[in-house]
């Protein structure tokens, strides 16, 4: 049963604010609108909000105004610098949020920044949750994301009705724990991506049909969610973005900042960095197979 802080979340009463209407964010907030919540969106380019306005969404002129108009504000943006500016800036969400309000940052960002946001929120008698997600654009469209939540357990439980419109919520611990969980997730995804890319290139160089090779191995020990989601796209060289390659570089970079010995992660980051350096940072993660192809003399 959801916690009644400060009163039970209800679509007819709880005002939701949203920042971030990119590949995933627009689908995620659409689920919240469909559930009957009142949603106000802030975007630097108001033209991007037109579709959400047709679904009943309103717009705010600044992050501060969004905070003033909302009980809960969700953010899912590009990087930690964006998060800092939008939440902690002089015209940021927390400068407008009333006591008792809650921020939920779903960006893949730094655990230390999540703890900083939490501390500032509490100083203002507000609350903050870090809640990055996994599942890509398909999970966002289908409302089947996995949400890694860090913060106060009672607040995360209180948020459950609205967060469950977007996927499954996994509470990980105190502030920053959600972000640490997401970084660990990306370490595994990055490693799986490189292994899958190398397997496909090996199959091609060995004279096998990469698609048939995938069919042959997917139900054995080599099978994985990464293979299911990205294998055929890699094999046919469909690099439509479900998540930008440049974001994988960012995420693996945050893992490197943890100052732990992770040689595989360091190598994987280098390979994705090469992809970005080739001008392919806005392609999907699966495009890293082209880096492996080039290393093996394939065009």
Swiss-Prot record:
Give the enzyme's EC designation: 1.1.1.31
Leading EC class: oxidoreductase
Biological process (GO), any one:
valine catabolic process
What are the binding positions for NAD(+) in this chain?
14-43, 108, 250
Report the sequence similarity comment from the record: Belongs to the HIBADH-related family. 3-hydroxyisobutyrate dehydrogenase subfamily.
| One GO cellular component term | mitochondrion
Molecular-function GO term, any one: 3-hydroxyisobutyrate dehydrogenase activity
State where the protein is found.
Mitochondrion
* Coiled-coil regions, chain positions: none
- Residues of the active site are 182
Q: Which named protein is this?
A: Probable 3-hydroxyisobutyrate dehydrogenase-like 2, mitochondrial
Which keywords does UniProt give here? Answer: Branched-chain amino acid catabolism, Mitochondrion, NAD, Oxidoreductase
Matches recorded under Pfam families:
NAD_binding_11, NAD_binding_2
Which lineage do the record's taxonomy fields give for this organism? Eukaryota, Viridiplantae, Streptophyta, Embryophyta, Tracheophyta
Q: In which pathway does it act?
A: Amino-acid degradation; L-valine degradation
Q: What organism does the UniProt record list as the source? A: Arabidopsis thaliana (Mouse-ear cress)
Give the chief site where it resides.
mitochondrion
Q: Catalytic activity, per the record?
A: 3-hydroxy-2-methylpropanoate + NAD(+) = 2-methyl-3-oxopropanoate + NADH + H(+)
């Amino acid at each position: 049963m959801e916690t009644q802080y400060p009163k039970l979340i209800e679509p007819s009463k709880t005002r939701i604010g949203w920042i971030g209407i990119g590949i995933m964010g627009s689908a995620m907030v659409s689920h919240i609108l469909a559930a009957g919540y009142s949603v106000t969106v802030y975007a630097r380019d108001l033209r991007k909000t037109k579709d959400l306005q047709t679904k009943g969404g309103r717009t705010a002129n600044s992050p501060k105004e969004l905070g003033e108009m909302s009980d809960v504000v969700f953010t899912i943006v590009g990087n930690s610098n964006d998060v800092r500016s939008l939440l902690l800036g002089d015209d940021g969400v927390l400068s407008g949020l009333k006591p008792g309000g809650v921020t939920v940052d779903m960006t893949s960002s730094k655990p230390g920044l999540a703890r900083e946001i939490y501390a500032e929120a509490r100083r203002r008698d507000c609350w903050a949750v870090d809640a990055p997600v996994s599942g890509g654009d398909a999970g966002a469209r289908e409302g089947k994301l996995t949400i890694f939540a860090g913060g106060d357990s009672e607040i995360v439980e209180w948020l459950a009705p609205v967060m469950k419109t977007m996927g499954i919520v996994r509470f990980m611990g105190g502030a920053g724990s959600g972000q640490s969980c997401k970084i660990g997730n990306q370490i595994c995804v990055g490693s799986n991506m490189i292994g899958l890319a190398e397997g496909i290139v090996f199959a091609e160089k060995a004279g096998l049909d990469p698609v048939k090779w995938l069919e042959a191995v997917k139900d054995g020990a080599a099978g994985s969610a990464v293979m299911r989601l990205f294998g055929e796209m890699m094999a046919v060289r469909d690099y439509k973005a479900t998540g930008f390659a440049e974001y994988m570089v960012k995420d693996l970079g945050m893992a490197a900042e943890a100052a732990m010995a992770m040689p595989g992660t360091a190598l994987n980051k280098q390979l994705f960095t090469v992809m970005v350096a080739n001008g392919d940072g806005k392609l999907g993660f699966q495009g890293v197979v082209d880096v492996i192809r080039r290393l093996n003399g394939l065009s």
